[in-house]
C-alpha cells in the first residue's frame, strides 16, 4: 500500500449486517470481530494507521451495507465517546480501509494515555466482582502508587473503618471467619450469613468442576485482593445459602488445593512498593456429610488485602510491535497508563538521540521537560515564523530557501507547480526532514519540503536531481510516517493527520511516474486556517526538539520571548529597589536583560532617553547597546571623565570587570542617581535607579573592580532560574562553575562563587535549555583549527545558516594575527564568500572574528572558541566562550596535552 502508515492486513472478512447475520460459523464470526477490534486498539495505541480488510462478498458496498451490528457494537465498547472521532472508512475496490486516528482521551475524562478493551483489574463492589473500566483502573493505580510513595503500611484489615461505618459488613466478615474454623458441614445446612463485600458463594453443577473453578477464581481473587480481602466459598448456593459442596467423586481435595495454588501464583501483579510480596491466601477444604456419610467438600479460599494491584490476566489492550498486533503485558500497561519512564536516567531527550520515539508501542513518549515552557509560547512562535495569509504560499525558512533556489535553478518554480492550487499556507524546507526528526539522511536527496495548507492534507515532497538518483526506496515513506508520529506525540496535535509522501525530480520537473495516487477520508484534510495554525504550532514543538536551521531560528526567538518575560518579572522591583545588585550566572543572558531594563525604566518612570545612562567596559558593547535601545551609552572611562547632570537613572553591565584606576565609579554612580538635598527645606532629592549587573564567574583581571564587598551588595537579586542556551552548552558552563567553586581562581571571590548551586542550575537547564551542539577538539595546529572552522562553516551555510549567525572568538587580542590569515585561506576554499568583522561591527553581515573580551556582553547562535594553549591551561576562558553561544559551541585547542 502507498500509505505512509502502520498497516494491518486482516485478510478476508465478512462485512455488512445481513452477511454477518447469515454466518453459520460462530467461531469464525467471533474471531473476525476480535481480530478487527484488537487491530483497532493496537493502532489507537501506536500512533494510528490503516486496517486493510479484504471483502468476502464481491457485491458488498460499504455505502449500502455498512459494517455489521456486532462490529459496530464492539467499536462502541472500545470507544464509548464515539468511534467516529477515531475511525473513518473508505472502500477501494474489494478492500475496506479503516483509518485509525491515534488515541486521544475524551477531554472531560481522566487523561488515559492508552486505550483498552478490558483492564482485567478487578475490585469488589458489594456482591459483585467488577472488571474496572479504564478510568476506574487509573484511579486505583494512582491510589496504590500514592500509598506506596507515602510509605503507608499494608493494611491486613480495616476494622477501624468498618466498625464506624458498615457494621453489617464486619459482622458478615466475622461470620465467614468463624465458618473457616469449622471442620465439617452438613449437606443442605443453611448458613447464617450472606454474600457481601467480603464473601462470595459459588456452586458448580457441571461435571468438570475443577476447570470451572480455575475459570472463575482469577477475577474473584483479583477483586478481593484489590479491595479489602475476603472469602471465596465454593460449594454453597448463593441464593438459598445452603451447603451442597462438590461431590467427592468429582473432586480430589489435594489436587484441588494444588490447582488453586498454581492458579493464584500465576496471577500477574504490579508492585509500587519495594518489598514486592506475593498474593497472600489460605485454602481450606471442609468435609460435607449427608446422614453421617461423606458427601463431598466445600473449598474456602481466604484472600488477604494486597499491597499493590493484582490482575486476573494481562489487560486486554494491544499495540503494534514489529508490525504485529501484540497484547500488552501488565508491566507495560501500568507504565503506559501512569506515564512511568522506564529509564529515569535519560536526562535531556531530543529527537535525534531518543531511539524510543521510534517504537510504535511507545507512541506517546514523555515530552522533554523544556517543551512545557515552550507550550506557553508556541502560538507566538508560530505566528512569528509561520504566519498563514490568504496570499501566495510562503516558503520557509527564508535563509535555506534563498540558498536552495540560488543553487538549483527551477526548484522554486517546480515547488510552486507541485503545490498549485494551494495558496493559503506554508511550505517548510529542510535539507533532510529525515535527519531533523532522528532518521538517517539520504545523500542523494536534494531537499525535502513539507506542505501545510488549507484544503490539503500534509504532503512531504522529496526532491531528487534526476530519476537516476533513486536513493533508498523507503526514505520518503519512513520520513512521512515518523513526522506524523512526532506531530501527534511531541507536537500534541489532536486532530486527524496524515503525511502523504511524494518524490519529484528537478531535472524532469515532475513526479516519479510509478507513484500511485493516495487518497484519505475528508477529515484528514486541513479544512481551515485555524486547523493549519494548530498543526503549525505542533510543528514548532517538533522542530524545537531537533537540530536544524529552523530549530535554531525558533530556539533563538523562544529565548527572546523568555527573556522578555524575565524582564517583565524583574521590572516589578523598579519601584521598591532603586538600587539593586543583580548577580547573573553564565547562560542567563545578563547583558540582554540589562538592555531590557532600560526600556522598562522608560516605561515605568515615563522618562526621556537622555535621562537614562547605560555604562559598560568596552567600546564594542557600548556601540551594540546604542543600536539596541534608545538611551545614552558610555564606557566606564567616559563615565569617570565626563559629567552627566541630566541623568536620572543608570544601568551598569559587566561591573565585575570594572576597575577603580580612574576613580571610584560606584560612588559617582550613586551620587548621580541619588543626589543629596542642597539644603532647601522644600526640595526633595531625586532617587533614581541604579542597577548593577554582574557575573561573579567571569572576572577577567585581578585588579579591584570597585564594587562594594559582597556582604555590602544589598539589596541583591540572583538570576539563576532561566537558562537561554542549548543544554549541551549549559552543561559545559555548569561543569566549569563547579570546577571554579572547588578551585577558585586568583581573581575570583569565593563568597560570590558560592551563588552557584548545581541542583537548581540543572533544574533550570531541564526547564528551558533546548537541544544544541557542543564539540571540543584538542591538540590542533593553527592550520588544523582553521580547516575545521572553514569546513564546519561551509557545512552550516549549506544547511541555510548565514555568516551573521557565527562568531569566531580567540582568547587574547594578540591571537588575532595567529588565526586571521589561516582562516581567510581556509574559508576561501568554500563556495560561499564571507567577510570577517570585528565585534564593533556586530550588527553587520559577516562572521565576527575578535577576542572574547571585545565580544563581551554579546552572543551569537554559533560560536567557535579558539585557544592556542592546551585545554588544561585555559583558565576561565571555556566559560567565557560558552556564555557567548546560543545553540552551537565548538571549542578548539592547540598544545599537546590530551584530555
From Swiss-Prot:
Cofactor note: C-terminally truncated SLFN14 endoribonuclease: Requires manganese and magnesium for its endoribonuclease activity.
Region span, Required for endoribonuclease activity: 195-382
Name of one Pfam family that matches: SLFN_AlbA_2
Tissue specificity: Expressed in spleen.
GO CC terms: cytoplasm; nucleus
UniProt-listed SUPFAM superfamilies: P-loop containing nucleoside triphosphate hydrolases (SSF52540)
Keyword Nucleus: yes
Keywords: Endonuclease, Hydrolase, Nuclease, Nucleus
Any Gene Ontology biological process: platelet maturation
EC number annotated for this UniProt entry: 3.1.-.-
Region (Required for ribosome binding): 383-562
Domain of life of the source: Eukaryota
MF (Gene Ontology): ribosome binding; RNA endonuclease activity
Keyword Hydrolase applies: yes
Cofactor(s) of this protein: Mg(2+); Mn(2+)
Entry protein name: Protein SLFN14
Organism: Mus musculus (Mouse)
